[in-house]
């Protein structure tokens, strides 16, 4: 157990350990579970989840954990239409992303990020894969900080592009498929 395996980081910590232990992991549809609004907490939530992910991956890579993780295709959960997030709240995330980007040195070589940029699913998966290459070379928190502005801009692009639950579900499925293909490619070519 590491410091980030509590709070928001617990789900990813347990899931990665289960996957590396060869256990079958599946998502259970909860139906119409109503979540408390969390858009305003997304930055601290992301920091904890991402740091927990990178910390756990680093631990698992250096342990004797089983590494034949199967990323078999699973269907994205059907998203439930929620209250739309206001344009002002989305614009605030974009402003925060630009502020964090300007004040956080990046760990990866990439294109500059500007407030007019759209972080598409393709660019997002590329950013994720580039950050995977620095696991073990710097702190997990530092990796999470480096990826945070890209995540916020991905959220902004996602919200701008998807105005209903079906479109949002399709976007998540396409992004997941792309990430699995890229992960499998990286695993066999590096």
Can you say where each PLM-predicted feature lies in the sequence?
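Conserved catalytic loops of nucleotide-sugar-dependent glycosyltransferases that act on lipid-linked
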Residues: 1-55
